[in-house]
Amino acid sequence: MPGNGVRGLAGRSRAWAGTRTTAILSVVKMSSTVEWTVHVCLTLACAPPGTLMQAGALAEFHGLPKAYLTKQLQALVKSGIMRSTPGVRGGFSLARPSSEITLMDIVAAVEGRADLFQCAEIRKSGVIAESGLSNVNLPCIVQIEMTKAEMAWRKALAAQTLDGLARRLEKGAPRVVDLTRQWISAI
């Protein structure tokens, strides 16, 4: 009967691996809010310095719902990425130079800074734990590698500034930048 146990274990391992892979990939997935806020910040980075844009204009420019975008803009204000100027002629602007605002700043403002991977220490249960072969006194190798990968991801986002993105956009798609500036000057 050992063969049946091994086959059963192998089947569970494959099922676990598929589920775990899906869970890991879904954790790394960012919300559409990140895309929206990066594009909005990039729009302001391409605008003339000191440009104020109302939430409705930003929402219209990007084809986004104003109410939801306004909520995200407030998160950017709270984190010091944007400034909100009240009044009829008020609006939103970048609070710092675009060279000082990173993609990681924006992601953290809208998604938070919590670790992406949360180790549930499943190695403390199941067949290996029951066998006594699992040394839970050592750090979890999965946790170590996932943390290293997350740190590399955060470092890569922290290395990308809005200014760098704006310069790349201007070089690669100058007509998009021109249209953006024309649209802003017309409002």
What are these regions (language model features)?
Residues 40-47, 109:
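Short amphipathic alpha-helical elements of helix-turn-helix/winged-helix folds
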Residues 2-4, 12-25, 119-187:
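C-terminal regulatory/oligomerization modules of transcriptional regulators
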Residues 52-63:
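A short alpha-helical element within helix-turn-helix/winged-helix DNA-binding domains
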Residues 45-50, 96-97:
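Short helix-capping/hinge SLiMs at alpha-helix to coil transitions
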Residues 22-40:
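Short alpha-helical segments that sit at the start of domains
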Residues 81-89, 93-95:
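Beta-hairpin "wing" of winged helix-turn-helix
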Residues 63-83:
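Canonical helix-turn-helix DNA-binding module
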